[in-house]
Amino acid sequence: MEFYLSSDCASLARYVSKVVYLEDNDIAHIYDGELHIHCSKIGSEDFSFRTVQKLELELSKIKKGPYDNFMQKEIYEQCETTKNVMRGRVDAFTNRVVLGGLENWLTELRRAKRIIMIASKASFHSCLAARPIFEELMEVPVNVELALDFVDRNCCIFRNDVCIFVSRSGETTDTINALNYCIKKEAVTIGVVNCSGSSISRFTHCGVHTNTGPEKGIATTKSYTSQYIALVMIALWMSEDLVSKIERRKEIIQALTIVPSQIKEVLELEPLIIELCDKKLKQHDTFLLLGRGYQFASALEGASKMKEISYVHSESILTNELGHRVLAVASDNPPIIAFATKDAFSPKIASCIDQIIERKGNPIIICNKGHKIWEQDKQKGNVVTLEVPQTVDCLQGILNVIPLQLISYWLAIKKDIGVDLPRDSAMSAPDI
Amino acid sequence: MCGIFGYCNYLVERSRGEIIDTLVDGLQRLEYRGYDSTGIAIDGDEADSTFIYKQIGKVSALKEEITKQNPNRDVTFVSHCGIAHTRWATHGRPEQVNCHPQRSDPEDQFVVVHNGIITNFRELKTLLINKGYKFESDTDTECIAKLYLHLYNTNLQNGHDLDFHELTKLVLLELEGSYGLLCKSCHYPNEVIATRKGSPLLIGVKSEKKLKVDFVDVEFPEENAGQPEIPLKSNNKSFGLGPKKAREFEAGSQNANLLPIAANEFNLRHSQSRAFLSEDGSPTPVEFFVSSDAASVVKHTKKVLFLEDDDLAHIYDGELHIHRSRREVGASMTRSIQTLEMELAQIMKGPYDHFMQKEIYEQPESTFNTMRGRIDYENNKVILGGLKAWLPVVRRARRLIMIACGTSYHSCLATRAIFEELSDIPVSVELASDFLDRKCPVFRDDVCVFVSQSGETADTMLALNYCLERGALTVGIVNSVGSSISRVTHCGVHINAGPEIGVASTKAYTSQYIALVMFALSLSDDRVSKIDRRIEIIQGLKLIPGQIKQVLKLEPRIKKLCATELKDQKSLLLLGRGYQFAAALEGALKIKEISYMHSEGVLAGELKHGVLALVDENLPIIAFGTRDSLFPKVVSSIEQVTARKGHPIIICNENDEVWAQKSKSIDLQTLEVPQTVDCLQGLINIIPLQLMSYWLAVNKGIDVDFPRNLAKSVTVE
């Protein structure tokens, strides 16, 4: 008999496929080829047994394949991962979304008076990205909370609140603390995770698995887009019985089906981005990212990637907050990256970008293909454009974030930074 | 953003020099609002001619330009109208041709100054170019001037001699977006038009005689003779029919009027309001001052009238007429004349080098004033007259939504936790612009709190209108009497901070913070379980002014830090947790806007999610390490920083043993501030950051009170 003990299943995958998870306050005693589990506190556990589970991790999935770094591999996997999160769940013919993990809680979820989405960092950004579509489809207030701040504040939570916990690893300490808090307050809890058997997936009432596969790079890339789609699917699923939303739901579902191929198109921007990093961006150590509406989350996520991977101080700003102080910094010529894909706010975004151009800000604009509004400025060298396919406004952020992932990656490569193991960051943040 | 100023004198003799000085002085007082170019328009030497002077840069540059042009300053005018503008570029970079006033043609037939953004200006410009007009500038405002000329000429050709306000209505029909607008024309000598939509505008009235009434009637057109919709693109034939039909209807209406009493009543009200200056109807010397901000009017008169959106003010023959550019059911019939309370001396700098410094040092007084007469320290009570009648409704609210921009948003973040603690009502804090973009669901049992120093912030105003439409109860927390938000909300609290001239908000932040805390205390005053907490907070508030005075003594130390540790740095990280997260964000904002250093506020516990990658021995870090329930976790986060060779500056409480011990073994510095209740500590902790921003800017030789690209009141969205 052999036993392997680990804090993460990735290190076990090559040796075994059967595992037992310890709960809090468990004491495992291994001797004479036997495993004994004791409880350090009387009455603190409901369960009298621990099930042996089967690991599904494949060794090959953890290899880099033809890519130089895991991060690059995972960026390119987004064509498949976005497809996987929808597989068997989105039916484009009947325009329905099926989420088996939530089915038993349908009544409670649709009765929600308020939805609270709780997460940290990249998962927090995916919640921000999905928030407007929840509000639109369900017509209930939606709060997005940083898990840490949520717990610090001892927020008001009620029985008819629905709390959604988003975490790639399912082990993020702050998010788990928030989850325990909400369970105590009797709210209905949903987990959106990428690891089956993780704490959050086991403690929440119900949930959705993002089916993303292992993510080895520290910087979250494919998990972000998968979480984004999972959340949109939840919103579609919860709003299914509203007649007034039929057309909108149909529009979104049809657009979801072509997202994977559109991502493939965006990835073709890589040569242009490499050139851009070489010529324009490499020598800078401060960046500003501007987004509005659905694209504010894209700006936040992009800024986060650049901090983590390229070590540049980047900050995301709501485009229309320019007038509130941020423009003071713009004239010192930090590179400015602005999201200007088409949606309800396009004229206002164009106006803000005009103001930047007037101050010689020379922005990089992520816009849709065939968008002519900056053609003249482009000729004059005032702007650089990165063109992405157009999709429904609430899904555009999935495409828009990918150029930023590539920029972060290539900036790091150009600066000779270890991409997959950046200093001071961790995949799971279990400790405070 | 931009500033508008207009001056009209009627039967008051003024030399051209005096008129120029009045206009330029008006701009000087608006300079803090936006300042990359300035200009004025006055009557020329020949009848029906206009002089326009404009220049890039500050008001002082305009003075030099006028001196250079050397107009005859001794010519006197018994009646005159002049307009002026200070600009913040939104379309077209700062260049002389892009300065306002903008004109319709080389003969200066129509001259316009404009605040705001015309969102359909590209289409208008294309249309006008196709009709043969030649543009001199890249501005959206020039479209307005040329549109005036086009519509004037078209109507003239069709035999219609329109009144100035009638012509203006036709122009406004074509404009989309926001505007605060003044227009002057040689075709309407000694007349000026003022109108607004989304941008603030007020009119000051000055006369030797006592005002007869304190309101001006709004003049609505006859119901069945409303102005016709005349689209610009219609052909001449259909275009020409409109006004003629309007007159026919009007005549018919008069003939059909069989109710003499009603007619008399109308005439009486009409003449009464128009002649509000005169007892006997004889012409009276009068001066009008039109401005986008009361600060430029207060020197001349305290009697002011605020225009509403879609009001159209027409000043001529010593009279002020208010029309509506579009009719609304239930719209107010009058505009009241209010008395400003702002004193001139309050606006001046006093012994300080900059308004910002003055305002930082005023915080012991401004915080005291916010609380004065509202907190009873003996009985531990909070009395907010502006909210008193509405408190039971607020207590029953399903949700509180706090909506603001910039620094005001940070004051909401700072107080959110105490609201939730004291009221047990869920609280959302929203950036106004994002709130609008999302079309957030708002219900009748929501209470929406709008916080704005100026009371004119465009995004906050739009969000307010959005919430009113949905039946929510609205509360305003503002610092300006008579501002749009204070007049449109159901109830509110005035923060009594006094005028804030420096573009970076300092004393308004602390006053807003206190006003919000008082609001939260009011909500909880019927709860037994909150009594001890309320007493603790109220007694803590009592000490705040004195404690702020104490923190200000850190200035020499901070000045030195800025000259040594922080000099020549490009980036800065601020760490705060819990109540201090808002202080970190606000501190970062101050540093960004004043010293142009890229700084970011981070929740201390979020370090490990990426931000820690930035930490090394070179990056300056400021951390809030004052005592509260999260203190051990904050210490742990800071240890992670020092373990990676970071050497933070810790803002901690006086005589704190933990930091005293650590500073012996770790490379860190401390700034010691007094200790107070956790939910009030942010009031103390922000002061060192304000001073830091100020001295970083001064050491860089930056103009502290007028930072580039920024404006005091963001009135465009």
From Swiss-Prot, chain A:
GO terms for biological process: chitin biosynthetic process; fructose 6-phosphate metabolic process; protein N-linked glycosylation; UDP-N-acetylglucosamine metabolic process. Residues 105-244, 277-422 form the SIS domain. One of its GO terms (molecular function) is carbohydrate derivative binding. It holds the Pfam family SIS. CDD domains: SIS_GlmS_GlmD_1, SIS_GlmS_GlmD_2. It comes from the Eukaryota. Keywords: Repeat. InterPro entries: GlmS/AgaS_SIS, GlmS/FrlB_SIS, SIS_dom, SIS_dom_sf. PROSITE patterns: SIS. This is Uncharacterized protein YMR085W. It comes from Saccharomyces cerevisiae (strain ATCC 204508 / S288c) (Baker's yeast). The lineage of its organism: Eukaryota, Fungi, Dikarya, Ascomycota, Saccharomycotina.
Curated annotation (Swiss-Prot), chain B:
Keywords: Aminotransferase, Glutamine amidotransferase, Phosphoprotein, Repeat, Transferase. It catalyses: D-fructose 6-phosphate + L-glutamine = D-glucosamine 6-phosphate + L-glutamate. The active site is at residue 2. The keyword Transferase applies. Residues 390-529, 562-707 form the SIS domain. Gene3D superfamilies: Glucose-6-phosphate isomerase like protein, domain 1, Glutamine Phosphoribosylpyrophosphate, subunit 1, domain 1. Pathway: Nucleotide-sugar biosynthesis; UDP-N-acetyl-alpha-D-glucosamine biosynthesis; alpha-D-glucosamine 6-phosphate from D-fructose 6-phosphate: step 1/1. The modification Phosphoserine is found at residues 253, 336. The modification Phosphothreonine is found at residue 334. Residues 2-318 form the Glutamine amidotransferase type-2 domain. Pfam families: GATase_6 (PF13522), SIS (PF01380). Induction: The activity of this enzyme increases in presence of mating pheromone (transcriptional regulation). One of its GO terms (biological process) is chitin biosynthetic process. InterPro entries: GATase_2_dom (IPR017932), GFAT_N (IPR047084), GlmS/AgaS_SIS (IPR035466), GlmS/FrlB_SIS (IPR035490), Ntn_hydrolases_N (IPR029055), SIS_dom (IPR001347), SIS_dom_sf (IPR046348). Its EC number is 2.6.1.16. One of its GO terms (molecular function) is glutamine-fructose-6-phosphate transaminase (isomerizing) activity. It is an enzyme of class 2 (transferase). Present with 14300 molecules/cell in log phase SD medium. Involved in amino sugar synthesis (formation of chitin, supplies the amino sugars of asparagine-linked oligosaccharides of glycoproteins). This is Glutamine--fructose-6-phosphate aminotransferase [isomerizing]. It comes from Saccharomyces cerevisiae (strain ATCC 204508 / S288c) (Baker's yeast). The lineage of its organism: Eukaryota, Fungi, Dikarya, Ascomycota, Saccharomycotina. The gene is GFA1.
